[in-house]
A protein has these predicted regions:
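N-terminal pre-domain/capping segments
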Residues: 1-100, 120-121, 138, 153
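Active-site acidic/histidine proton-transfer and metal-coordination neighborhood
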Residues: 78-167
């Protein structure tokens, strides 16, 4: 049977260690066995402490995120793509280190409204970045979950057909 989960933002803004720990405690106390955290920057949070608390409370962790324009792996700019690949690598490692099993969200482009269609080069850059990240995630025991979103959140994957074609 699948576990029922809840996003940490229901309980807290997710900006502090104490807030995330409180979200874990409240989730467990109300019967949830899975919590979704927004992107965890390793330099900001004590991932070992969060992992221990989650384990003690028997709550699984999933992490979701969207890339900023400065780290858009669907960009035509190699430096921006590289920044995105580095951010995704860091995110996979953070999910692994916190004992999580899933990294999801808008991992394939920036989380923003675009005013142009994606370029062929940008799409290929995104596919290559996700393939590279998938290899790292597989080795780390982390599933990647690509969130297909509406056109106001990304220009690359807006339909199930586009998502299936992408993978």
């Amino acid at each position: 049977m699948r576990k029922l989960g809840i996003h940490s933002f229901v309980w807290t803004g997710g900006q502090t260690q104490a807030g995330l720990e409180e979200a874990l405690e409240k989730s467990a106390a109300t019967g949830y066995r899975l919590i979704e955290f927004a992107y965890l920057r390793p330099e900001k949070f004590d991932l070992d402490r969060l992992a221990k608390k989650a384990q003690d409370l028997d709550v699984e962790i999933a992490v979701t995120m969207g890339l900023p324009l400065s780290a858009d792996v669907s960009s035509d700019d190699p430096a921006v793509v590289k920044a995105g690949e580095e951010m995704l690598t860091s995110a996979v490692k953070a999910v692994r280190d916190i004992g999580g099993g899933k990294l999801g969200g808008i991992l394939y482009s920036a989380h923003t409204k675009y005013f142009t269609q994606p370029t062929d080069r940008g799409r290929k850059n995104s596919i290559a970045a996700i393939a590279k990240t998938a290899d790292l995630a597989k080795a780390a025991g982390v599933d990647l979950v690509l969130e297909i979103v509406n056109r106001f959140e990304s220009n690359l994957l807006n339909t199930t057909a586009q998502g299936l074609d992408f993978i």
